[in-house]
Amino acid sequence: MESGNVVNVQSELSGIIDGSKSYMYEQLWKLCAGPLCDIPKLGEKVYYFPQGHIELVEASTREELNELQPNCDLPSKLQCRVIAIHLKVENNSDETYVEITLMPDTTQVVIPTENENQFRPIVNSFTKVLTASDTSAQGEFSVPCKHAIECLPPLDMSQPIPAQELIAIDLHGNQWRFKHSYRVPRGDTTGWNAFTTSKKLVVGDVIVFARGETGELRVGIR
């Protein structure tokens, strides 16, 4: 419904805003994207540069996109509002990217914005730069004691060899099983080699673990 040049797009957005991803997915995605990744918020005003977009597409596809050149004279920049944000990951890798849907801000648009005061579950996480021993075929992934205590489920230290199975979910929704045991140092052994082989991890890659309040464990790479 339109009134006085004010448009409420709540109903249209209900099918556009990506609510299929969990809060843990969002947090892991941001950790994998890294601290330099800055994403606008839902409802924010941004500028869209048509010519710059075309040039980026040409550079990524290595093809000239003359058919995309507009027949009319577009301004160098268009003021828009962010109406949808989708945090995604490449199918054949763990490279993160974001799809942002914009609406030209030609009217005063009422768009649902993020509630900064809403409850946010606590998520503990840690990152580690992989070493040669972490990525070797005979190696294991050693977790610093501080990170293991903060981010991993507690071990039963009354056992002769405290150990447990961890199930962690990556950004693709795949489950990975690791054996977490207390030794010197603590290590994730069984299942780790399968993970490093599948992800093609090398020295210098960064692994990310995140655990929510409910105990849900997530794993990713940067």
Swiss-Prot record:
Residue ranges of DNA binding:
126-222
Q: Which GO terms describe its biological process?
A: auxin-activated signaling pathway; regulation of DNA-templated transcription
Q: Tell where it localizes.
A: Nucleus
- GO MF entry, a single one: DNA binding
Question: Where does the UniProt entry say this protein principally localizes?
Answer: nucleus
Keyword set, alphabetical order: Auxin signaling pathway, DNA-binding, Nucleus, Transcription, Transcription regulation
Q: Which InterPro entries match?
A: ARF_plant, B3_DNA-bd, DNA-bd_pseudobarrel_sf
- Domain of life of the organism in this record? Eukaryota
Q: Which PROSITE patterns match?
A: B3
One GO cellular component term, please give it: nucleus
Complex and partners: Homo and heterodimers.
| Family, per entry | Belongs to the ARF family.
Q: Provide the function of this protein.
A: Auxin response factors (ARFs) are transcriptional factors that binds specifically to the DNA sequence 5'-TGTCTC-3' found in the auxin-responsive promoter elements (AuxREs). Could act as transcriptional activator or repressor. Formation of heterodimers with Aux/IAA proteins may alter their ability to modulate early auxin response genes expression.
Q: Give the protein name, as stated in the record.
A: Putative auxin response factor 23
